[in-house]
Amino acid sequence: MAIALVATYSVTRKSGLDALDACRTSKIMGGSAAIGGPFTLMDENGRLVTDAEVLAKPALVYFGYTYCPDVCPTDAARNAEAVDVLEEQGYEVTPVFISVDANRDTPPVLKEWTDFMHPRMIGLTGTPDQLKAVAQAYKTLYQVPENPVDDTYLVDHMTQTFLMLPGTGFAEIFSHDDSADRVAEKTACFLEATTASN
């Protein structure tokens, strides 16, 4: 069983409300701009892509690995279900899966896994240094065993899903316990607020 690292996020509030504040339940200390940033990674088709390409539309971004026995497939399936619920409401949201297991999650492995989860899910991988950098940008933690005895090792990792919006960046964090309906409802709130503010 994969062990999820536990992190506590401090809840903060600005003195003035922006158009998205009514939808937010939490923020990262330092503000929402503290989450995310530029990256270049390899997608499941073996193509180098940037954050600008991957996050050109609203996205649910999750860090995990395909060999994860329980948490990752559960969360990825939940995110995929939320994306389908949102699509029924007229919203296009991209499910993104960033692997933190550079050794095993090659593009072909990622492609098979993400295609099974959702036809529009984007799988990303990179070198250990690239993955470490993007994980740090998203304030997420993981730990790959340094010298595994075989290919059956587990990777400890956090289980948050990040809602990223074009032109806004980080909007919200969803936990492992949030249902697909909850993720869809909160995401729709942000998308409606973004549309109303434009």
Can you say where each PLM-predicted feature lies in the sequence?
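Short, small/polar residue-rich loop motifs at catalytic or cofactor-binding pockets
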Residues: A34-G36, P58, D156-M158
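Thiol/disulfide oxidoreductase modules built on the thioredoxin-like
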Residues: Q130-K186
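Structural microenvironment flanking redox-active thiols in thiol-disulfide oxidoreductases
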Residues: T74-V134
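Short active-site neighborhood of thiol/selenol oxidoreductases, capturing the structured segment around
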Residues: D51-D75, N79
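Hydrophobic beta-strand anchors of alpha/beta hydrolase catalytic cores
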Residues: L60-V61, P95, T161
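N-terminal targeting signals for export/organelle localization
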Residues: M1-P38, F190-A193, N198
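A short beta-strand-turn-helix
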Residues: F39-A59, V83
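Short acidic-hydrophobic, aromatic-tinged amphipathic segments that line or gate anion-handling sites
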Residues: M42, I122-G126, Q143
